[in-house]
């Protein structure tokens, strides 16, 4: 649904499903998918060699991780001692689900047709947040696309928290990351993104997100906070009582 009678970005629909047709011999260089979205892909015909890249030490600082992945995306750099790689061979009917910020390259040895799409998930916003941080820090050089629906979707997912199944588990780092992206949207905005406008709805979402962050003890972008400290960036954190955290808003 649109916020305050504004038009919904076409990206809200376009990213949900897409189709790609490639001739044989096409190679897509290493990159991460834009705006920290997860990806699914299904091969309809042909073959895809999908190579996934991982940090040898996921507890490194953000700047160190960024440097390694930035080197990976340099076509002239051939050796990457800080990274490991795994190649998945996808045949017709195979489904690949890729987490946010997963650096990957794709080689198409035969003519191929693939369908897929992008999505956000409450289970992996800790990966979405750092992927969007990488995007902004290097001004979009690590990705091959720009989406304009991200902030609107993230705000909707904040508003949607009270409507989740009460039995659902949410993790601390994941919930913190979602809230931080809503509270500080300009920190994750590329210049080519649509202008961020302050509205009653965005203020409402930011108030909810701020209450959640404060209830969990920060971090308000304090670099000394454990969220930004020496931890594995793929660690979603421990379970949190998210129903208690939003209890004030359940009454509204």
Q: What residues fall within each predicted segment?
A:
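Eukaryotic intrinsically disordered, low-complexity regulatory regions
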Residues: 151-214, 221
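Active-site region of the double-stranded beta-helix
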Residues: 1-92, 102-168, 211-252
């Amino acid at each position: 649904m649109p916020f305050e009678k504004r038009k919904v970005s076409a990206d809200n629909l376009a990213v949900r499903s897409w189709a790609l047709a490639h001739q044989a011999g096409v190679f897509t260089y290493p990159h991460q998918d834009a705006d920290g979205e997860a990806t699914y892909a299904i091969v309809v015909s042909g073959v895809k060699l999908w190579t996934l890249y991982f940090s040898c030490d996921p507890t490194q600082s953000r700047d160190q991780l960024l440097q390694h992945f930035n080197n990976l995306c340099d076509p002239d750099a051939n050796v990457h001692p800080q990274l490991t790689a795994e190649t998945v061979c996808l045949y017709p009917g195979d489904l690949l689900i890729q987490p946010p910020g997963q650096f990957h390259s794709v080689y198409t040895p035969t003519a191929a047709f693939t369908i897929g799409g992008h999505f956000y998930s409450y289970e992996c916003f800790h990966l979405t947040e750092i992927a969007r941080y990488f995007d902004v820090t290097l001004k979009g050089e690590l990705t091959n696309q720009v989406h304009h629906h991200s902030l609107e979707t993230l705000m909707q997912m904040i508003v949607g928290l009270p409507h989740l199944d009460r039995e659902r588990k949410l993790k601390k780092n994941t919930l913190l990351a979602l809230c931080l992206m809503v509270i500080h949207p300009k920190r994750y905005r590329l210049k080519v993104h649509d202008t961020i406008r302050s509205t009653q709805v965005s203020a409402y979402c930011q108030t909810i997100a701020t209450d959640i962050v404060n209830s969990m003890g920060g971090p308000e972008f304090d670099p000394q906070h454990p969220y930004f400290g020496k931890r594995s960036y793929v660690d979603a954190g421990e379970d949190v009582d998210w129903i208690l955290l939003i209890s004030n808003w359940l009454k509204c």
